[in-house]
Amino acid sequence: MKHFDTIVIGGGPAGMMATIASAFYGQQTLLIEKNKRLGKKLAGTGGGRCNVTNNGTLDDLLAGIPGNGRFLYSVFSQFDNHDIIAFFEDNGVKLKVEDHGRVFPKTDKSRTIIQALENKIQELGASILTNTEVVSVKKVDEQFQVKSSDQTFTSDKLIVTTGGKSYPSTGSTGFGHDIARHFKLQVTDLEAAESPLLTDFPHKALQGISLDDVTLSYGKHKITHDLLFTHFGLSGPAALRLSSFVKGGEIAHLDFLPNQSQENLKNYFEENREKSVKNTLKALVPERVAEFLAEDKADSKVKQLHPKDLENIISQLKDMEIPITGKMSLAKSFVTKGGVDLKEINPKTLESKKVPHLHFAGEVLDINAHTGGFNITSALCTGWVAGIQSPWD
């Protein structure tokens, strides 16, 4: 059995950064990944461009992590989004900032980010073992025994970075939760987060339409971001973010023009009373949305509208009701809500309170963040903090 100071299970962003951090601090480190290549799920993020972080403030970060984000105060005091940016720039990756603070590599290729992480792991002398699935983990005489189908390794410290259960085709099968349960740690219920929404709505007429900076809300939760109408309902950042707060059976409200008041819109229609309803609406929303809202009044002039019809159009622009029937399954969601119970974890070190030198990082924890760079930020930062902890204390 070969012995390492630290073994990391799971080669996503948290695992790669944990490996880098532990190797940087002098730990002989092994990273084990079940897929043929590291970063399989990371490769598909940001439409394959890899939205590696967000350049916002600490408050922005916490707002972008609705699922227990405040647990990360101590983590972010040690390593935050600005450290992520500095890390990649120091390692030769040129970055750019797009709308909503989203940070991407200038190459627009996720491979650039993955390659930088892999290169750093190799530069620091850590070992990588891919195409290797861990089948069991146990602790014997203060050492962890990690078994694959044909090998056994031991370590003084173990970091579990196996992700949640979303997109299992990328390797996220929930194995890390099984490890936690083996060591008698609590795991909270798992459900879909950052999931497209299923709706009871005549959405086929709007299928494929993308809207910029609209407001989608349910109760006290208001999300202003981009939205996409699909054949099944709603997707895009606004829908994905709202999915953390709904289960099905709710009524969501869509404001196409959050920067316009109803009074302003009344004045706008009055100023354009000689134009057709469709053309008047086209100046505000995409043409197919204009046709959808105008219904059979599209070719009528605004001045010909009955006051109640005009009132209804304005009401639809500002407060369209969309019944939510459910969410995509956990397997088709971007993020897992739930995970290793944070009551079990030291927030400063991400170490188990019950099992010394057992650490968890990334989405395996009960932390869920929005798309837009927040989920990867959480993974990279928790990975770093778990990695820097000494296996010899």
Regions found by a protein language model. Give the residues of each.
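Beta1/beta-strand and adjacent pyrophosphate-binding region of the FAD-binding site
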Residues: 2-14
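Core beta-strand elements of the Rossmann-like FAD/NAD(P) dinucleotide-binding domain
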Residues: 2-4, 148-157, 223-224
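Glycine-rich FAD pyrophosphate-binding loop
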Residues: 7, 23-47
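Short hydrophobic core segments
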Residues: 7-9, 32, 134, 153-169, ...
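An anion/pyrophosphate-binding glycine-rich loop and adjacent beta-alpha core
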Residues: 36-38, 43-44, 52, 58-59, ...
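Glycine-rich active-site loop/strand segments that organize a redox cofactor
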Residues: 49-97
